[in-house]
Amino acid sequence: METAPDEAPTEFLEPGEEIVENVIEEEVVHEEDVEHHEEDGEMIEVQHEEVLEEIVEEDGMMFDTDGRVIEYSDVMVYEEGTEVIEEYVEVEDLGDGRYAYVMTDDIGHRRLLKPHEVEAVKKMPGMMEEEVVMDDEKAPNTSYAAAQKRGRFPPQARSSLSPQKPRAAGAYMGPEAYYQQPKRMTHMAKVDVEKYSPVTPVNRRPLMDNAIFKSKLPRKSAPWQEETAANGGPQSTSLIRSPSPMLKEPLFDDNEIRFKCAECGDGFPVMDRLCDHMIKQHDCQTNVREVQFFADRDFENFLLKVEKATLGRDPEDAIRKKSRAGSSQLFVCNYMNKGRQKMAELVEVGIVGLSERPLEVCTAFVQKTHGYECIRVKYCDQHIHYDGNIGFRVPIAVKRRLFEMSFKRLPIPCMQIMLGLEAEQLLPHPTRFEEKLKNLSHVEIIELLQIINASLRKHQEVEPRGKKVPIKFETIKSSEGSQTLMVKRVTPPKKEHMDYDEPDPNIPSTSAQALGYNPDDDEGDDVPMMSREEEVLDDETGEESVMTEDCDGMMEDNMLYDPENNRDPLFDELTEVELGVLDAYEHDIEIALTEAQKKERTRLKAKFALNKVIGIYQTLDTATHGLTAGELHTDTINHLRDMASYVVELVCQIDAEVKVRRNPALRIDDVKRDMIAGIAMQERVHQPERRPRRSAAPASPAKPQYRPQPPARSHEEYTQRIMNKVKEYMPRRRPDAYDLQQGQQQSRLQMLREQTLLRAPLEEEKPPVATMAPVPDEHKAIPWTRPGRKRAMGPGEAATAPAKRRGRPTKKEEAAEAAAKLIQAENEMVVEEEEVEEPPVVEQEQVPKEKEVEVAEAEKLPEQVKTEPSVTPSSAPPTPATTATKTRTGRVVKPKKWDDN
C-alpha cells in the first residue's frame, strides 16, 4: 500500500542489511540516472535516455514525455548570429606553493592568465573552492536489481537551506564515498566567453567524444515506464544540467604521425616538433617565431611580405590572402599537396583539412590566433623543397663553407669540386640533399652567394663597402680535351646623358615613354611619371648596378677570382686540398700569371711539403724514441718511405724552379714530373743492394738433375730433405747493411748472455712441483680393446691353451708339418728373453706332448713376431679327442669341436 507524501514510507529490509535513516529529499531526481564518471566523483553527467528523444516545445516551455516542464538552470542561450568560444581555466601545481593558470579554448590555443585575470577567476563563485563531499547515507547502488522501489508519490529531496551536519567520527562511509577525493586546485573550471560578431556565422567544430566519460549500458526498462499516470500528482519538473566540462584534449592524438620528415622519415604529431627536428638533425633554419598585430590589415600585409620573401614573387591583389575577423586561421605551404610542376604558395586549410593532408609536408606555415587584446601569429618562413630558390633548403653549414671559399676568392669550379669532396662532412646525416650538393651548378652557387651576402648586409651593423660586378660564364677546352668553366668580369657600358631629342621615326616607341607625348611641348617642366626612368640604386654604395643583356649574373667584386685584375686568392688562408684543386684548375684554363704570382704559388707548395716532412719526422721521432732498428713496426717503416718520397718531391720542385729560371720556355710541373718519373724508373731498374751481382768466378760443375736417394725412413727425414732442397734453389743475395747490423746485434746479445751465465752462481735444479697427486695403477683407465670370440673350454683343457683356428679342419699330417715349420722359423730369429711366470702345473695325463711344446714356444715369442706380416697364418693343429661325459641319466655326451658364443 502506498503512503502519503508526508508520511514515512514502509520499506522491507533484506536479511543482514543495516537500518539507515531514510531522508526525504525535496528535489525530484527520480528520472535521472546518476553516474560517477571520475574517480574523485566531482563530475556528474545526467543522461535522459528516452526523455531527450521526445521533447515537445509549446508556448515557450519544453515538456518531456510525462508532461513535466524541462528547466535549463545553467545553460546560457545566445542570440542568433553570435559566435561562442568556450574557454577553460586549468590550474597546474608547479610545486612550492606556486600555481599556473592556463586558459585553453575550443581550438586548442593555450595562454597564461594575467594577474588581474587570475584574481577575477578566483572571485567567481564556485570556481576555485575545494569541495568536500559529506555524505551521511550509504553510497547508492545504481544497478537495476537494487534500485529503490518507486510509487506514485516520488520521494522528496532534502531542503538545501538546512545546514549540513558534519560527519560523525564513527559514521559509516560507503566504499565509493570512501575513495572519493576532494576537488583540487588542479582541476579545470569552465568559463563562457561571448564574442559578438554578427557578421561571421557560427562555425564551431564539435568536440570529439571523451574516452573518460563512457555511457552506461541501457537498462531493460526505464523506471518511469512502470508507473501509471492515472492518479498523477502535481506537475513535476525535470532538471537538465549542462554537461560537465570535459578534459581538454588535443585535436589530434599525440601518437599519430601526421607530419613526416622528408629527409629521414621520422614522424611528428605537430608542426612545431617537425621544425625543431629539422634544426637539430638536418641543420635547417626552420625556426618558429611569434609576432603580434592589432588589426587584420596588418596581418594581411605581414602575410604578403612572408610570401614575397620566401617564394620570391609578388602575388596579385585578386588572390591576396584575406584575414577573417574574429577567427583563427592556418596557412601552410602546398608544395607537397599539388603537382611538382606548379608553383608553391601559402594556402589556408581548416582543422579537418589539415588532418587529411599528406604526411610529407613543407615546414613553412603561418598560424593566426585571435586573443583578447591582439592577434597572435606563429610562423615559420623556411621551406624545405628544392624548386625555386636553392637557398630555401641549403643547411647553414654549407652556406658557411661557401662563404668561406668565396672569402678566399676561390673560382666557382673549385667551389663545386670542394663541395663534392666535403659533402659527407658538411651533412652529418645522410639525406637526399647530399646528391644535390655534389652536383650543384655554377648558377646555383652564384644564387647562393647572393643570398648569403644579402643576409650578411641585413644583419651587419657596419655596411660593407664592396660593390657588385656583372659576370659572364664561358666554357673553354682544356689541354686534355675536357670542358672547363670560366667566370669572367663583364665591363659595364659607359653611362650616356639622356637628351630628349626628336625620336627617330624608324625606331618604335617603348613603354618607357607615353605614346603621343612630346617632351618639347612643355619644355621638360612636367615630365609624367611613366616617362621618367627610376634609377635602381645598389643597397651598399648607392651606385647604379648595371645588368646588361650579355651578363649572366652579379657577384661581389671582393669575392671574384680574377688574377689578371689583381684579384688573386688569399694563399695564406688556403688549405692543401684547396691549393691542389686551384693548381689543377689554373693548369686547365692555362691562365697567364706574373712572376710574383708564380713565386707565391711555389712558396705555398714548398710550405705544405715541408710541413708534411716535419710532421712525419716528428711522428717518427716519437715512435722510434728509445727503440732499435730491429724493433721498428712495419707501419713506421712505411711512414719513413713516405717521408723520403716527400723529400724527393720537394727537391725536384726546387730543381725544376732553377731550371725554369734559366730556360723560361719550360714548365715547372712538366720538369718536376719528368724528374720524379726518372727517379722511379731508376729505382726499379738499378737496385745493386737488392739484386745479386754476377761474379767472375768459374762456374761450378753442373749438378745432375736427378740423384737417386734411398727412401726416407721417417717423416722428419723427408721434411728435412725438402727444406734442404728449397734452400739450395733459393737465390743467394748479398747481405744488406740492415742484415749485417742485425747479425752484429744478435752476436752481441749472445756474448752478453754467455758472460751472464758464466758469472751467475749455479743453482741446483729443483724437480718440478707436482700439481696433482699421482694416480695409482688400479685407478687408471684401461684402454678399450675390441672383444674377441672365445672358445668353450673342455673339462680337461688348460686356460692357457692357444685359441683354436676357425674354419675347415685340416688333416693331421698337414697340421703337424705346418706346426714344425712354424717352430723352426721361430727358433731362427733372435729374440730378447724376458722373465716369464711359470705356467700352472697341469697333470701329464690331460695335456699331450704336442700341446706342451706349443704352449712353451708361444709364451717365449714376443708380440711383434706374432704380428709380422711376412709370416702367413696357418691353421692350428687339431686338439685330441677328450673323454666323453656321462649325464645323470647315463647318456653319453661328446664335446663339440667348435663352439661360437
From Swiss-Prot:
This is Modifier of cell death. Residues 829-840 have a biased composition (Acidic residues). Residues 147-169, 218-245, 494-528, 682-717, 779-901 are annotated as: Disordered. It comes from Caenorhabditis elegans. It comes from the Eukaryota. Residues 846-866 have a biased composition (Basic and acidic residues). GO terms for molecular function: zinc ion binding. One of its GO terms (biological process) is programmed cell death. The keyword S-adenosyl-L-methionine does not apply. Promotes programmed cell death. Its role in programmed cell death may be in conjunction with cell cycle regulatory factor efl-1 and the synthetic multivulva class B proteins dpl-1 and lin-35, and is independent of the ced-1, ced-8 and ced-9 pathways. InterPro entries: RegFact_GeneExpr_CellDeath, Znf_C2H2_type.
